[in-house]
Amino acid sequence: MSHPALRQLRALSFFDDISTLDSSLLDWLMLEDSMTRRFEGFCERVTVDMLFEGFVGPEALEEEGEFLPDEPRYWLREILLCGDGVPWLVGRTLVPESTLCGPELALQQLGTTPLGRYLFTSSTLTRDFIQPGRSDELWGRRSLLRLSGKPLLLTELFLPASPLYGEEK
């Protein structure tokens, strides 16, 4: 967790009451479709810069563990999602090892493919919740998703250059 954006992501404070948030902000934070697809409307090319990818133990989960089953190993993927080479979002995906069977094994082979390009082509994708959060002046969210009923937790932090902030103002 050496990248500064990951430290900010881990510092997100999440909240359930969204009634005071601006509708244009909520349009981003509560988006149920692919964030990759949303970003593609604001640039020529969306790319992934890999920060970390590999198995970790439960000690790497901290409070995230309350949303995932207890297992000895989890697949962790930490990335920067960039629009035309500019980092717009830092993402952290935690996948219990038991989720990585059948078609979901492909989650380990995404490489620099955006997660959304895989997730939103699956007919078995469901979402339990989206929870908005904030770290200093930056907005983020976490989502518990399921593929064929098997969980994965995605946490995203919108970086200062993200189009979210251009629309928010």
UniProtKB/Swiss-Prot annotation:
Matches recorded under Pfam families: Chor_lyase (PF04345)
Database matches in InterPro entries: Chorismate--pyruvate_lyase, Chorismate_lyase_/UTRA_dom_sf
Entry superkingdom: Bacteria
GO molecular function: chorismate lyase activity
Main localization category: cytoplasm
Compartment(s) of residence: Cytoplasm
Any one Gene Ontology cellular component term annotated for this protein: cytosol
Pathway noted in the entry: Cofactor biosynthesis; ubiquinone biosynthesis
Residues where substrate binds: M35, R77, L115, E156
Reaction catalyzed: chorismate = 4-hydroxybenzoate + pyruvate
Gene Ontology terms describing biological process: pyruvate biosynthetic process; ubiquinone biosynthetic process
EC numbers: 4.1.3.40
Keywords: Cytoplasm, Lyase, Pyruvate, Ubiquinone biosynthesis
Subunit structure: Monomer.
Record NCBIfam families: PRK11655.1
Family, per entry: Belongs to the UbiC family.
Function: Removes the pyruvyl group from chorismate, with concomitant aromatization of the ring, to provide 4-hydroxybenzoate (4HB) for the ubiquinone pathway.
Stated name of the protein: Chorismate pyruvate-lyase
